[in-house]
Amino acid sequence: MGQGAAENEMVVKQDLKVVAEVRRFVRLVTGQWGMDDFVPCLVASELVTNALQHAESATSATGDDVILRLSRTEDDALWMEVQDAAYGLPHMLAADTTSETGRGLFIVDQYARCWGIRALADNVGKVVFAVLDRT
């Protein structure tokens, strides 16, 4: 991972209203790094909203909170990861044209250089990550 990951971490409480705060946090960090914030804000919104909507009442080291981490890679891309305590692994859905949900990971897939999922040890949750090129 990149530089300063511990300094660029936000604990997100289980409330969809805080997604606006997530975007403010992303704007602050990307602004400090001289990066455009549109795509990072969009991807963070989708990943955090997905984590909050699908969170289970699970006990783990992080409790039920969602954690957003931002760092830079060696080639100056943005590494974004969202950690939650839910056991289920997300997957892209084939949303129809009238559906109001189900497009989050499709949006992430369109904008990220790459993205993926890794389960945490002892089945205490997962991390969904995305790498965004500097624009």
Regions found by a protein language model. Name each.
Residues M1-E9, L52-T135:
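Conserved beta-strand-loop-beta-strand hairpin that lines the nucleotide-binding pocket
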Residues D37-A61:
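Conserved ATP-binding N-box helix of the HATPase_c
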